[in-house]
Amino acid sequence: MLELGAGLGLPSLAAAVRGADVLATDWAEDAVELLRRNAERNGIALRAEVVRWDEPAPLVGEAPWRLVLGADLLYERRNADQLLELLPRLGGDALLADPGRPFAKGFLERAAARWEIETATDGTIALHRLRLR
């Protein structure tokens, strides 16, 4: 399992506790370091790496990923653009949680050309499941 934009990595930590082989990634070195320390302190085995979406060789090299997770990623247009380029190269399904960021709607409209998209929402957070066609 791959998490993009992991930040503190709660989804990655939870998946690793349940036995998943996890790579948690973020562009911010300090976030990745905190995630590593948290995993180590709690005896959780996972990998955490600094990766930029515009330099995805480490991620693509391990593709296909069975599952790609991301939460609150679509707050900038460049994130939406880079994610549209990157996701098809990773393979597998993607689960993206979004709190209604401004670029989510456009991202989903463009993604629908290549992906089947299912959305569930509680009125605050939307969870989008993307499957390559």
Residue ranges and their predicted role:
Residues 1-133:
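S-adenosylmethionine-dependent methyltransferases
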